[in-house]
């Protein structure tokens, strides 16, 4: 697995010393040697590479990476250029259009958000090709919970967007009154109409950031 070189490195050092991480490291290494695994190994930690801790303003939590070829690149909900926009992200774009008037772009590449401080964190950071959730229960959840804990302890306001029951379980890790926790159903076509549409999380996040002296996020993804 690639090394993390920014300010996450020191904060995550205690995790690397724990027995679960050694097991996780060995499991992931073996999986990449035997199977097609997504994302490519160099992209596993892109959420952390693109969004240093000091820059984190918003956290969006996903479950595990896309499991088809050339989609996943280490940011939840995001796909590499050249892919069709997945259904959940299409619904995120619809809500952005309704909430902030953002036009719906022709791609699903969300690095622009990550570069502005939106941590796009999957709870599980790898997956076997064509086999959703195949790497669940091997230690990634403990590692990404540690990331959430680190952000929770930050003495500055951060917005957490928790979409769907899986992400909302993470509320038990969040007890810092400085932060804003926004909850809605998942943007999946199965649940978006039950309250994701109309949640206005993006404007709520920006209003909170502005109220706390931070620059808002430019949520508009440009056409490629």
Predicted stretch roles:
Residues 2, 7, 14-162, 166-169, ...:
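A polyanion-binding, active-site-adjacent surface
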